[in-house]
Amino acid sequence: MTTPSRASWAEPYKIKMVEPLFMTTREQREKAITEAGFNTFLLRSEDVYIDLLTDSGTSAMSDRQWAGLMLGDEAYAGSRNYYRLEEVVQRCYGYKHFIPTHQGRGAENLISQVLIKPGDVIPGNMYFTTTKAHQELAGGTFVDVIVDEAHDSASCFPFKGNIDLAKLAAVIELHGAAKIPYVALATTVNMAGGQPISLENLRAVRALTKQHGIRIIHDMTRVAENAHMIQRLEAGHAHRPLRDIVLEICSLTDGATMSAKKDALVNIGGFLATNEESVFEEARNLVVIYEGLHTYGGLAGRDMAAMAIGIEESLDDDHMRARVGQVQYLGDKLIAAGIPVVRPIGTHGVFLDAKAFLPHLPQECFPAQALAAELYVEAGVRAMERGIVSAGRDAATGDHCRPALELVRLTIPRRVYTQAHMDVVAESVMRLHEARSTITGLTMVYEPTYLRFFQARFVRRPGA
Amino acid sequence: MRHRTIIEPFRIKSVEPILLGTEEERAAHLAAAHHNPFLLGSDQVTIDLLTDSGTSAMSAQQWSGIMVGDESYAGSLSWGRMESVVRDLTGFEHILPTHQGRAAERIIYGQLGGPGKLFISNTHFDTTRANIESGGATAVDIPIAEGRDPESEHPFKGNMDVAALERLLAAERERVGAVILTVTNNTGGGQPVSLANVTEVSAACRKHGVPLVIDCCRIAENSWFVRHREPGMCDVPYREIARRMFALADAAVMSAKKDGLANMGGFLALRDDALADECRNLLIITEGFTTYGGLSGRDMEAIATGLQEVFDDRYLEYRIRSTTFLGDRLHELGVPLMRPIGGHAVYVDAKRLYPQIPVHEYPGQSLVCALYLLAGIRSVEIGSVMFGTYDAAGALVPAAMELVRLAIPRRVYTQSHIEYVAETFEEVMARRGEARGLRITREPRFLRHFSAHFEPVG
């Protein structure tokens, strides 16, 4: 894998509007993290210096998107922003039908309710928290069919988002196609470290599912980033425009859920897309109950306007080169300093390998949760745990699910932070790495039923 | 001098064009929309009185909030602002943001409802009823008798029938999920609920240990009526009246798209810790994390500011008096109306306007189509299209009333727009004998009024 030269990712934009950052002292941060139960989700944004919690909804919009915001048509029914967005979704992604939702999980809720029956099995390229929760609420069970390399943080396999065709075939064999409403396919795979799927693999998955008459539902929240990796790393695609690859990826699937808060550069919004008339009809009946009338789906007209513009901007080759280039820059700095991170570097963040970072802590001491908390105390940098806390408990045994990957995600918001901010982050992680032996683990003192990572509370374990 | 003219307590800072089409163009649009104005494009509409929900003009202060919105995923400062404004207004400890009101309803009624449960309201609104019934529970309306009589001039026609409530609670206590007071009562004509009625309802609920939920999406408008119509309330500030109502309840749901003066957003407010925990779990799965609930930071800013602006004395005076202005003009023309005029809309009684159209041919929908054809005015039927059901034999069980709602968006239209609407009604009255009904040619399972198709009868 080639590292792009620094000049190649210079941002293809200049800054038009700024927002102040908050500087805090170590004492203030120590107090803030204690009050937040050592859960970075529970910190107040004013206590955070550099916020790498998520790339979701945190993008800087362009001046055109802000202009779109001003032109929002807030009519309850038939807003022109809806028709414009429908046209953009159809043209850029190729799906026939589209229903806006207030965000991605609204679309996940709809598709799970429409397609999943109790007892169904949904194979996918690694779970995602909210996706799995909706599948389970609808009575389904998620089965992981991602390639083994995805669970190995040190493997440098370039397409760790790929589906293992043998695993998928075995799941179909075991349960029968009738029990599988769809294959859940994510581009890129967030929980594996923002890893892409190759076009070759996707074509093979399409061929296999077609034989059995099984749908592919595409979690397309970072499809443009995935397409960029195909362009960069997969033989024969270097000269294809991003738009073209995105369209091909979508054409190999039957429907999609989209959180537009990632690729599409907006602060709120999502949609459900499908090529099937019957699924569309059913989902349109449900959307009025959960989200809003199907011509706004719980979104203000202005946010539909910003989304239509954001989708177009996300498919610009220069934009994407700078976006992924910035993430790679941070990753390469950390690799050069000997910090254990998930390899290769993904597209939306750098994932610290907490097991290797803190080898003295067993998984029961929540090493990734502890590392995220200590990184905040060290430098005011907010990251997110993606390990045993996020994985939740096994519904049958009640025990913790123990994922092979115990990660801390440093997620890079789009167009928000500069190279100097990335340097500060890298230095902070290096400082913490030097002091790693002083980090004690955590004890969980409050655990919610669903998606516990959002609200769980912890205390520090006493030092040795 | 004391002026009779009520002027807007603001001037216009930003405008949006509206399109003026011809009657021929509108006839084509209406046919393409299957005689359901919900299916019209907004650029085919001249005066959009479809709803007052999410259609307000925001203030300069709110737009500046849009610019400073903090889009942090967790712990956003804008959430901190909205939470403190809502907590201060409602007095409830737990505030959960939602992307709009129906999400707040779905979360709390999902927790309190389910198969066999019973919900009692002064009148359930369409999305509320759908939320409750899709979970397998039953929704029962018990407005006072005057609330069902379009001509009654009772000052608080939104009140709940307390005797009927007592009877239901005595007989069905175990089944009751919650008692819901919608203030003002939208379906019943935007009619207010008195503080005295809330007090009595609250006492009955507490006696039987049943939670009282206030649907507060128009509580500021309700407060105007309480202050001006209820004995002893004339010196109590609007905001204080609202606070007293909240103090009598156990929870509140709000669509901030009405009295929040926002284009998007809502919240659920709760007193009970355990219920709040359960609701937060559902919130995270279906809406978003607890500090944004599916809203952008900027929209939370706009709501925080809007909830403060809406209780301004001069704003409420303008708001209620300008709605009454349209009502009075139509009343003078002899248009049969829901009396007295409510807070956010004028409700025309289509059954009396078009006595020749039987209920199963939807007189309300006929008027909705006529207003669009004549003048590009978009309104909404609140009658048997919205609330009708079918019996076992497939015959229509009609709604109690056949109304057409002319909802006035907040701070959007001027007096001349309203004069244009009134003038259109002169024509409607002149041609009332020619009106024909419609039949439904296609309808979805839930909330059929949003997307049903119609064709004219005969």
PLM feature spans:
Chain A
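Conserved PLP-enzyme active-site core in the AAT-like
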Residues: T2-F38, L42-S45, D51-A60, Q65, ...
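C-terminal, active-site-flanking charged/polar segments
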Residues: F22-T25, A370-V377, M430
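Conserved active-site loop/cleft motifs that coordinate metal ions or position small ligands
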Residues: I99-P100, R382-E385, R409-T411
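Short amphipathic alpha-helical segments
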Residues: I268, H348, E406-L410
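Short, conserved charged micro-motifs
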Residues: E281, P359-P367, R415-V424
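Conserved small-domain helix->loop->beta segment predominantly found in fold-type I
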Residues: T295-M304, I309-A373, V377-A404, T440-Y450
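PLP-dependent enzyme catalytic core of the Aspartate aminotransferase-like
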Residues: S390-A464
